[in-house]
């Protein structure tokens, strides 16, 4: 494992994201999830990331169970404040205390104001979030604090300029260099000596499968053959100015592959030719992808029962595969009660989407696309 610095701490460059844990029947597969976290820590990962909302509020409890037997002492723990639930100043400590209880710890190493955007940042300012975090550091309930971000670049700059932050967490991958905070935001934060955590390095798995045929052909021309995961993660690891790269792994096979990549790809690991190849890859994806959904599921649950991430995933695959009959047939594999055509345009989902997608409009377009 290669290690980097985050808020003065020595951290593994690959972090374990407890957002997409293995499941059975819609619930966390506890045994397999714990086995994976133990293997991750035994293999050198020392940063485990969770949040109040992950897995419908059960991720923190699972991490607590995984940290028994000495594993807590071997790893940093990160979780996040559910800012969207805050209605008064005191709510911040109420939720923090609940999270300390969930995680069965006295102190959280890295605490983030979760998924900041213009609305939740206004909540933070109204209810004195920064003052709260500073007080919690003094109380010993948290060690370091920062924020995670999902909004437009100007909002990111406003938040960065508001405080002397230790670190921030941004979405970044070779398709998102100009999205949200983007590369310019990353560089701006570093100019302020703010350390960087990367999320969505595989764009919710969309950079792994299904691969457009044009991308497969392009990669065959590379001098060194890499898997889709290594192209995506390796490109991130080649950056010097980052700390932890989070990956939400759902299987032991994914974990083993990511560990191997993290152990052999560090700063400047890509040649200039490989970097140029990634630039071309981005161009090809931009030509094929229909919508920028990362499958984060922040839009869920839908009041009308629509499985929004699954619908958008099928829609993107339709375009990646050139609207083939096989891709078009995937629509039939979505259960009728959760298909896009059940959307009532209530709009509840829109404010929760980190990608700022006009979800009802896009679902309507999707229905027309598959009908055509």
Predicted regions mapped to residue ranges:
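A general structural detector for well-ordered alpha-helical segments in enzyme core domains, enriched
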Residues: 2, 32-36, 59-66, 95-99, ...
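N-terminal binding-site loop/beta-alpha segment at the start of enzyme catalytic domains
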Residues: 1-75, 138
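Structured C-terminal cap/extension of enzyme domains
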Residues: 45-46, 65, 184-372
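Glycine/proline-rich, positively charged
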Residues: 24, 84-199, 210-216, 223-224, ...
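Conserved, mostly hydrophobic/aromatic
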Residues: 16, 33, 40, 48, ...
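Short beta->alpha linker loops
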Residues: 54, 58, 150-151, 250, ...
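Short catalytic-loop micro-motif centered on adjacent basic/acidic residues
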Residues: 47-54, 143-147, 169-170, 244-246, ...
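Conserved residues at the C-terminal ends of beta-strands
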Residues: 17, 51-54, 111-114, 148, ...
């Amino acid at each position: 494992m290669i290690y980097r610095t985050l808020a003065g701490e020595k951290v593994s460059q690959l972090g374990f994201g407890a957002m997409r844990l293995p499941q059975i029947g819609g619930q966390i597969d506890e045994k397999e999830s714990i086995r994976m976290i133990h293997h991750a820590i035994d293999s050198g990962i020392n940063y485990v990331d969770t949040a109040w909302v992950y897995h419908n509020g059960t991720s923190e409890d699972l991490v607590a169970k995984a940290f028994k037997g000495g594993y807590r002492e071997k790893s940093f723990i990160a979780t996040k404040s559910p800012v969207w639930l805050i209605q008064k100043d005191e709510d911040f400590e109420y939720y923090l205390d609940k999270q300390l209880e969930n995680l069965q710890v006295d102190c959280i190493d890295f605490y983030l104001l979760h998924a900041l955007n213009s609305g939740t940042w206004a909540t933070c300012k109204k209810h004195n979030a920064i003052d709260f975090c500073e007080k919690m550091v003094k109380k010993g309930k948290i060690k370091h604090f920062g924020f995670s971000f999902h909004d437009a670049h100007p909002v990111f700059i406003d938040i960065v300029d508001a405080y002397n932050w230790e670190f921030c967490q941004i979405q970044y991958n070779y398709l998102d260099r100009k999205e949200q905070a983007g590369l310019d935001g990353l560089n701006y934060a570093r100019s302020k000596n703010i350390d960087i955590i990367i999320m969505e390095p595989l764009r919710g798995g969309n950079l792994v499968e299904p691969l457009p045929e044009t991308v497969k052909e392009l990669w065959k021309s590379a001098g060194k053959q890499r898997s889709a995961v290594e192209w995506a993660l390796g490109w991130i690891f080649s950056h010097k100015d980052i700390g932890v790269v989070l990956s939400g792994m759902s299987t032991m096979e994914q974990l083993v592959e990511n560990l191997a990549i993290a152990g052999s790809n560090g700063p400047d690991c890509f040649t200039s030719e490989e970097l140029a190849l990634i630039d071309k890859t981005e161009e090809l994806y931009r030509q094929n992808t229909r919508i920028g959904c990362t499958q984060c599921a922040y839009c869920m649950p839908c009041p009308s029962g629509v499985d929004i991430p699954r619908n958008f995933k099928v829609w993107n695959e339709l375009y990646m595969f050139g609207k083939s009959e096989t891709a078009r047939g995937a629509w039939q594999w979505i259960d009728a009660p959760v298909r896009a055509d059940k959307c009532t345009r209530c709009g509840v989902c829109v404010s929760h989407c980190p990608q700022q997608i006009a979800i009802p409009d896009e679902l309507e377009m999707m229905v027309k696309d598959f009908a055509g």
